[in-house]
UniProtKB/Swiss-Prot annotation:
Molecular function GO labels: rRNA binding; structural constituent of ribosome; tRNA binding
Protein name (record): Large ribosomal subunit protein uL1
InterPro entries attached to this UniProt entry: Ribosom_uL1_bac-type, Ribosomal_uL1, Ribosomal_uL1-like, Ribosomal_uL1/biogenesis, Ribosomal_uL1_3-a/b-sand, Ribosomal_uL1_CS
Oligomeric and partner information: Part of the 50S ribosomal subunit.
Ranges annotated as spanning the membrane: none
Family under the similarity heading: Belongs to the universal ribosomal protein uL1 family.
GO cellular component: cytosolic large ribosomal subunit
Alphabetical list of CDD domains matching this protein: Ribosomal_L1 (cd00403)
Organism: Ruthia magnifica subsp. Calyptogena magnifica
Short name of one Pfam family: Ribosomal_L1
PANTHER family, per database record: 54S RIBOSOMAL PROTEIN L1, MITOCHONDRIAL, LARGE RIBOSOMAL SUBUNIT PROTEIN UL1M
Biological processes, Gene Ontology terms: regulation of translation; translation
Function, in words: Binds directly to 23S rRNA. The L1 stalk is quite mobile in the ribosome, and is involved in E site tRNA release. Protein L1 is also a translational repressor protein, it controls the translation of the L11 operon by binding to its mRNA.
Length: 231
């Protein structure tokens, strides 16, 4: 086993592995432990009391975080007609139809979000095997299939988080950067938790929010006391 670095040892001294921290203390500790030379992301993982194998307990959606994520998002839009200029004016990185489809089929997939207007889905549908495995397939449930492409692009660019419970019933999401102040990070987390609360499946029984943990890109994972959140 490789020997721990001095930075790793310092983090271990600061972190109590079995402790459940208040959200304020957890975020302050992550910021204190952030030693990378880049602006690390702050990520949250929430264990939900759902049976992810049941289709009626599929938790997914999208929410615009009030303070953004601090991430530069590259957006591709499939649309035509008047929507081309609207998407471009909203900040889309590339807009197209068959030409964009061909580009993606050839391997140009350096996009974080793909948006499509309904009249473009005939083209986008041919990219199912390309976009689907990468989580890029436009979907009306998360607002990426819409006639209002300008709003969709703006949302993606200004901090929209798309989330989906995995097979274990856990939702993972980026909620900001270590450079954000604690208040901004807390607000983002509260907004995302409230969004999850609103779409709790009616068939899900028992405790819905089971466990919350947060971490930074290079830092420790910390358990958070759910009672310290405004939900």
């Amino acid at each position: 086993m490789a020997e721990l670095t001095k930075k790793q040892k310092d983090i271990l001294v600061k972190v109590e592995s079995n402790k459940c921290y208040s959200i304020n203390d957890a975020l302050n500790l992550l910021k204190e432990c952030a030693t990378a030379k880049f602006d690390e992301s702050i990520d949250m993982s929430i264990n939900l009391g759902i049976d992810a194998k049941k289709s009626d307990q599929n938790v997914r959606g999208a929410i615009v975080l009030p303070n953004g994520t601090g991430k530069t998002v590259c957006v591709a839009v499939f649309t035509q007609g008047d929507n081309i200029a609207k998407a471009q004016d909203a900040g889309a990185d590339v807009v197209g139809m068959e030409d964009l489809m061909k580009s993606m089929q050839d391997g140009d997939l350096n996009y974080d979000v793909v948006i499509a207007s309904p009249d473009a889905m005939g083209v986008v549908g041919r990219l199912g095997q390309v976009l689907g495995p990468r989580g890029l397939m436009p979907n009306p449930k998360v607002g990426t299939v819409t006639s209002d492409v300008a709003t969709a692009v703006n949302n993606a660019k200004t901090g929209q988080v798309r989330y989906r419970a995995d097979k274990a019933g856990i939702v993972h999401a980026c909620v900001g950067r270590v450079s954000f102040n604690v208040s901004a990070l807390t607000q983002n987390i509260n907004v995302l938790m409230e969004a999850l609360k609103k779409i709790k499946p009616s068939s899900a029984k028992g405790v819905y929010f089971k466990k919350l943990s947060i971490s930074s890109t290079m830092g420790p994972g910390l358990s958070v006391d759910l009672a310290s959140l405004d939900i």
